[in-house]
Amino acid sequence: MRFVCDVMLGKLARYLRMLGLDAPYISNPAQLKSYANKSSDTVFLTRRSLKDTKHGNKILIKSELIDEQLEEIKEVIKPLIKSDKMMSRCIECNTPLVGVDKYEIERFVPEYVFHRYNAFSVCTACKKVYWKGSHTEHMMEWIEKFMTDH
């Protein structure tokens, strides 16, 4: 399942990626409409009306607040969230992350990070490097709270 987020939902796209979901963020309205029409397993998330899309599911997001936006789609996304997929996509560009040897990324991370951590992942598209530091712990705490709140 793919969740295509429109220009008004960039932050929501990042949170969906954190949860391991495929969430492209597309800002061009013409591109959005053709994207939504391509596949029936696409859910189009928007803060605007989409009268002329013919295929795919559409969800109109009413809130401007990220916590409320996630609540609006929680019933749809919760069954799709898998623990082994969390934190597996680039939060910036949605590309699946690839594990790399720490010595391959030594020059791309601060020295203290290189010496403190052993497991690293990289986005092959935008080259952003990820590691399981305190930021990941905070994200995982948020995910756990999100998954258990009713």
Summary of predicted features, one role per range:
Residues 1-85:
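Long, charged N-terminal interaction/targeting segments
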Residues 83-87, 116-119:
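Short metal-coordination and nucleic-acid-contact micro-motifs, chiefly zinc-binding Cys/His arrays
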Residues 107-120:
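Short linker/helix segments within small regulatory modules
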Residues 101-108, 134-142:
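Short cysteine/histidine-rich zinc-coordinating motifs and their immediately flanking basic loops
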Residues 38, 143-150:
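Short, intrinsically disordered terminal segments enriched in charged and Pro/Gly residues
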Residues 95-99, 131:
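Short functional micro-motifs and their immediate structural scaffolds
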Residues 74-75, 92, 96:
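Structured, non-catalytic alpha/beta "coupling" segments that mediate domain-domain communication
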Residues 90-93, 123-126:
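Short cysteine-rich clusters marking metal-coordination/redox-active sites
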